[in-house]
Amino acid sequence: MITKEDIVADVVTDYPKSADIFRNAGIDFCCGGQESIASAVNHKPNIDLNSLLNKLNHIDNTEGNSTINPKFLNVESLIQYIQSAYHETLKEEFKNLTPYMTKLAKVHGPSHPYLLKLQDLYREFRDSMLDHIRKEDEEDFPKLIQYSQGQDVQNIKIILEDLINDHEDTGQLLNVMNQLTSDYQTPEEACGTWKLVYQRLQNIERQTHQHVHLENHVLFKKVS
């Protein structure tokens, strides 16, 4: 049973579908997930604690029971899971989405200047994430695996702190894009490309929150 004393990030780790409930309540389970549910709700005057707990305790986890629970993977297997589920898919999505983002800004940017700003933010987010993923795959993750196997790795705490700081910067960029688009609500005049871009940006946001949660609150805990 999930209680008000449970830590938000731990709940998402054990019950992945709870991420949607926390997201809808505006509760950060990613970079700010290390607080109790009660404490998180205290910052949200429009959220009823008992109602939230009721929703959390009625999560249907039948689908999750048949899938991998990353919590029980060792460090090397967990890293492989992260790379397959998030790194590779995100790189592919950036490749596919960028032409649509370019088209949207070119066609509708002159009459809707905030779309030009959105394009700049998207490019910044894309480039920083690609660089971050490359660094993790080529430099940081191999060191985490070595450390988990008992090998001597210098400055492991600094490595983790740097990665967490990168994640916080990523979260801030996502928040700015979310605010700029009013939580990806398209206007009435939005064309198909506009709707497509917003939908896929929103999906990237959700996937990135889950991605960062898995690294910050599961992987890094295993090696800290």
Curated annotation (Swiss-Prot):
Extract the GO molecular function terms from the UniProt entry.
Answer: metal ion binding
Keyword list, A-Z:
Cytoplasm, Iron, Metal-binding, Stress response
Q: Would you kindly state one Gene Ontology biological process term found in this protein's UniProt entry?
A: response to oxidative stress
Please provide one cellular component term from the Gene Ontology annotations of this protein. cytoplasm
The subcellular localization recorded is:
Cytoplasm
Q: Which PANTHER family match?
A: IRON-SULFUR CLUSTER REPAIR PROTEIN YTFE
Purpose: Di-iron-containing protein involved in the repair of iron-sulfur clusters damaged by oxidative and nitrosative stress conditions.
Q: How does it assemble?
A: Homodimer.
- Similarity-based family: Belongs to the RIC family. ScdA subfamily.
Kindly provide the name given to this protein in its UniProt entry: Iron-sulfur cluster repair protein ScdA
